[in-house]
Amino acid sequence: MAEEKLLRQAVWQCYQAEVTDQISVSNLQVTANAGVDVWGRKKPQPALLTVTVSLPQPFSSAAEGDVVDSSTVHYGRLSKSAISSVEKAGPSWLSSMDLAQLIEGAASATASSVSLAACEVDVFYPKGSMLGDGAGLTYSKAYGDNTISRVLYLKNVRVPCIIGVNSHERLMKQPVVASLWIDCLARDQTDEYIKVEQMLIKVSHSDSKPLQQYKLRPCIRPLRNHPLRHWSPLQRQWWLD
């Protein structure tokens, strides 16, 4: 089996620019014995699954005949295979990475009659964050060159912060909603979102603007495989380096 090449999500998406058609199912509700809860415990928890498969060629015949044929993937079967793979996983606990790969394998098997260009699986835990909307992992894989992407994220974490350098701005903390992505994530760090949220909260309590800007970097760096650039022009998001 060819060695997987880990890429930044934005770079991986550039490689998929020539993909013509995609089939996606979003927010499939399951209870998964995967990841960790807000207390860091390995217990079953609700999860929302989003699976997207990319085709190297347009499904013209299916569109012209208004029928699901061998040129495309039936989204109903794609949904059922993703949910079934989680239900059949058994009582053994899975890391978020293992769960994402399990679902990716099920999606690939469901589309066995179609040549897939890529598959992306997003595992989102609505109860995976104490102060935010949740946490999750996005796992992307291209089958042609075996390139992959792993992104750990926190969504809408609400923290009070001292913002600004003027004296009147430092009299009271202001509510801030922060979302955080960690790209090029190491495989064994896909369940560290609780630790990352704790780091984010700790930094937000600092009264120093420079600390708020830079203190997270040395904490998050060990979670990744290699450094990142500051700015992703494709996604228009800041990334820690």
Predicted segments with their positions:
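N-terminal, polar/charged subdomain of small-to-medium soluble alpha/beta proteins
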Residues: 2-241
